[in-house]
UniProtKB/Swiss-Prot annotation:
Pfam family, one: Radical_SAM
Cofactor note: Binds 1 [4Fe-4S] cluster. The cluster is coordinated with 3 cysteines and an exchangeable S-adenosyl-L-methionine.
Entries under PANTHER family matching the protein: 23S RRNA METHYLTRANSFERASE (PTHR30544), RADICAL SAM CORE DOMAIN-CONTAINING PROTEIN (PTHR30544:SF5)
Residue positions binding S-adenosyl-L-methionine: 195-196, 227, 249-251, 326
Record bears the keyword Iron: yes
Family: Belongs to the radical SAM superfamily. RlmN family.
Catalytic site positions: 115 (proton acceptor), 369 (s-methylcysteine intermediate)
UniProt source species: Jannaschia sp. (strain CCS1)
Note: Reaction proceeds by a ping-pong mechanism involving intermediate methylation of a conserved cysteine residue.
A GO cellular component entry from the record: cytoplasm
TM helices/strands, residue ranges: none
Protein name: Dual-specificity RNA methyltransferase RlmN
Cystine bridges: 128-369
Length: 392
């Protein structure tokens, strides 16, 4: 990431319709689904009702076989099967950590792969999903940043990660039962996987609106957290159009250090970022912003850093998540000593901010924060190759 990078990255997103193939309904907005049904011959007067019926099959019951959508006529189901598909990304491999964390390697159109992580806890289940193949930000402490950006994910590929996890966890509502028939295993979504979500804003927005829709997956916006490295111009739009919880990959208290750790800081330095964050809780009706802070030995973990951090965020409803650095092969940093992390947390706590220390999860399967990178990373492809695969 350089200081001259554009706000909207020049990265292709695969179309929902592959060459000479059917339209994939997964990822279409309600309006998009209705329009697709009308184009396929559904009378306009029936389109709203049909949209609602299909929506509930797809996103409440997890049924993607049109023949099983039994409240639709046989002829209508046959038309759907001839015209559309309802496909989610393919799970290539599934690893389960000793602590119960699950990591999925997922294949999408073009043969590219991303990673998805499910973290079970006593009172919640958090699904960490990706928004891009690779990443453009090159944050020096993050393994994902060493995998070059290939492309944005479509809305279908983003919400599809949620759906495949629910498949694996057997979380869908059985036909004939209410939406509260089963305990919710995926209770929270965090956009903290591969990629910068705000460089793929429209697709992330559409996918999260599907996740929040009350007739489908029905997650509260308070249970969805979008993590950004600080794409300042998109922060207000996130509050207005998504309204989810916001986390910021902060990681440093001076521009000199943050320029090295999070190079996007060269374009939007700390002062500009904090200015953009001050209005977010009010506009989005969120309780507070989460500041993520990775603890790097002798880099950003001094008492002076802790005191500066408290001063910087003064006046912003916030909590600070302290993240012990999760090492990966070739990493240029070390994790701060535990005593140092606790001392740092104590300074923040005494200043009146919650400062939980994140327990590393899934380290044995490289599923912890900052460790994600496609294990079978493909050879980099040229734009011409990507366009050819997409039928552009």
């Amino acid at each position: 990431m350089t200081a001259t990078a554009p706000i909207t990255q020049d990265v292709r997103t695969f179309p929902r319709k592959l060459p000479d193939g059917p339209v994939n309904l997964i990822g279409l907005t309600r309006d998009g689904l209705r329009a697709a049904l009308i184009e396929a011959g559904t009378p306009e007067k029936q389109a709203k009702m049909r949209t609602g019926q299909i929506w509930q099959w797809l996103y409440q019951k997890g049924v993607r076989d049109f023949a099983s959508m039994t409240n639709l006529s046989k002829d209508y189901r046959a038309m759907l099967a001839e015209t559309f598909v309802a496909d989610v990304p393919e799970v290539v491999s599934r690893q389960v950590s000793a602590d119960g964390t699950r990591k999925y390697l997922v294949r999408i159109a073009g043969g590219h792969e991303v990673e998805v992580v499910y973290i079970p806890e006593v009172d919640r289940g958090t699904l960490c999903i990706s928004s891009q193949v690779g990443c453009t930000l090159t944050c020096s402490f993050c393994h994902t940043g060493t995998q070059k950006l290939v492309r944005n994910l479509t809305a279908g590929e983003i919400i599809g990660q949620v759906m495949l996890a629910r498949d694996d966890l057997d979380e869908w509502v059985p036909t004939g039962e209410g939406s509260d028939a089963k305990p919710r295993l995926v209770s929270n979504i965090v956009l903290m996987g591969m990629g910068e979500p705000l460089y793929n804003f429209e697709n992330v927005r559409d996918a999260m609106k599907i996740a929040m829709d009350p007739e489908g997956i029905s997650l509260s916006r308070r249970r969805i957290t979008l993590s950004t490295s600080g794409v300042v111009p998109e922060i207000a739009k996130t509050a207005q159009e998504i309204g989810c919880q916001l986390a910021v990959s902060f990681h440093a208290t001076t521009d000199d250090v943050r320029d090295k750790l999070v190079p996007i800081n060269k374009r939007w330095p700390i002062a500009d970022l904090l200015d953009a964050l001050r209005d977010y809780p009010r506009v989005s009706n969120s309780e507070r912003i989460t500041f993520e802070y990775v603890m790097l030995k002798d880099v950003n973990d001094s008492d002076a850093d802790a005191r500066r951090l408290v001063q910087l965020i003064k006046g912003i409803p916030a909590k600070i998540n302290l993240i012990p650095f999760n090492e990966w092969p070739g990493a240029p940093y070390e994790r701060s000593d535990w005593a140092r992390i606790e001392a740092f947390a104590d300074i923040i706590y005494k200043a009146g901010y919650a400062s939980p220390i994140r327990t590393p999860r899934g380290e044995d399967i490289m599923a912890a924060c900052g460790q994600l990178k496609s294990a079978t990373e493909r050879a980099r492809k040229s734009r011409k190759q990507i366009e050819a695969e997409a039928g552009l």
